[in-house]
Swiss-Prot record:
Matching Gene3D superfamilies: Doublecortin domain
Biological process annotations from GO: intracellular signal transduction
Name of protein: Doublecortin domain-containing protein 2C
Gene responsible for this protein: DCDC2C
Protein location: Cell projection, Cilium, Flagellum; Cytoplasm
Lineage: Eukaryota, Metazoa, Chordata, Craniata, Vertebrata
A GO CC term attached to the entry: microtubule organizing center
Tissue specificity of this protein: Expressed in testis and spermatozoa (at protein level).
Length: 364
């Protein structure tokens, strides 16, 4: 029988357990690592193992003690149950790593369902629960087009939160001028939000033009109940208009609109106010402008009469109007050059005819 060779020595060194933190992270809870000679035979192998488990920028390149930040240089310096900080190329950052405690996740608060009052017989869910959870079924007319039947549109529940998306959804089936910009009820009330939409109601989609008041409810697609309701509203409005028109008094200025009467540029009839006092007649007794005695310089002076040969220069606007001859009279006096030319041409033609007649005259 053969003999066995000497067996290899078995390493009986117990494995070490350490806790590793991340450098500069106050929320990172330390991880436990078991150091065995088989997996981490060298310090470089240990750093590679830590790089796989601890997320450090550019990998784990250094180990420090958590309290004073002393650098660990080998496996022999590691103590069983010790705590260390893994870092990359950066410097050690002082934090209280030992007392980092894992935080419990915050509890999600459940919304309590609003229940109706006990003494109330109505058992209806609250509006805030059902508003954005139920889609809307509406019927939409095109503005000003009575002969086009209303389009049935289903607005999804997820689009009710945005009014622009609601209008875009309506614009996929209704095509007014310029696209759907506004939404009105059949009697002309503007809708500003999806909260005003009601199931199975009728609306009018309007684009760039204004809303046109047409009897949309007379369409055969509209239920008879809705038609009767809108017809009653129209009758009541017409009665009110007749009563208001009878009760009004006729206006003074029928031909002039009221805006022009109140305008600054509108001339109003007013009597002239005489602010100046009447002039005092000259020559009356006690007149301040009348000299009490005639002056000596003017006594014996003769009045000089104007001569007829003297010419006075009068301004243009004060001169008498002169009669200007019209162009027709001037044209009559001018010689008729065209007529004379025609006469000369006629004479030349006669002379030529005479010469031709003489040349072709037969000889006896």
């Amino acid at each position: 029988m053969g003999t066995r060779g000497p067996s290899a020595p078995v390493d009986t060194t117990p494995a070490k357990t350490i806790v590793v933190y991340r450098n500069g992270d106050p929320f990172y809870v330390g991880k436990k690592f078991v150091l065995s000679r088989r997996r981490a035979a060298t310090f470089e192998a240990l750093l590679e193992q830590l790089t796989e488990q601890v997320d450090v920028p550019f990998g784990v390149r250094r180990l420090f003690t958590p309290t004073r930040g002393h650098r660990v240089l080998g496996l022999d310096a590691l103590q069983a149950g010790g705590k260390y900080v893994a870092a990359g190329r950066e410097r050690f950052k002082e934090l209280d790593y030992i007392h980092i405690v894992p935080r419990k996740p915050a509890k999600i608060r459940k919304l309590k369902e609003i229940k109706p009052v006990v003494h109330c017989d109505i058992n209806v869910p609250s509006k805030w629960q059902t508003y954005h959870r139920i889609s809307r079924h509406i019927n939409v007319f095109t503005n000003g087009r009575l002969f086009i039947p209303p389009a049935k549109i289903i607005i999804p529940k997820f689009s009710l939160s945005d009014w622009d998306i609601v209008l875009a959804t309506i614009g996929e089936k209704v095509f007014p001028l310029g696209g759907v910009r506004k939404l009105f009820t059949m009697n002309g009330h503007l809708l500003g939000d999806s909260k005003d939409l009601q199931d199975n109601h009728f609306y009018v989609a309007v684009g760039l033009e204004t809303f046109k008041y047409f009897p949309y409810w007379k369409s055969p697609r509209v239920p008879s109940e809705v038609q009767q309701r809108y017809a009653n509203v129209e009758k009541n409005s017409q009665r009110k208009k007749k009563v208001d028109s009878k009760g009004k008094e006729p206006c003074k200025y029928d031909g002039i609109p009221p805006k022009t009467q109140d305008s600054v540029y509108y001339a109003k009839e007013e009597k002239k106010k005489t602010l100046a006092e009447p002039l005092v007649q000259r020559g009356a007794e006690g007149d301040v402008y009348k000299a009490p005695t005639p002056s000596k310089e003017t006594q014996g002076a003769l009045d000089v009469k104007e001569e007829h040969n003297v010419q006075l220069e009068v301004p243009v606007d004060q001169r008498q109007a002169e009669i200007v001859k019209e162009d027709e009279e001037i044209h009559e006096n001018t010689p008729d050059f065209e007529g004379n030319k025609d006469k000369e041409d006629a004479r030349l033609c006669e002379d030529v005819e005479r010469k031709m007649a003489r040349e072709w005259k037969p000889v006896d």
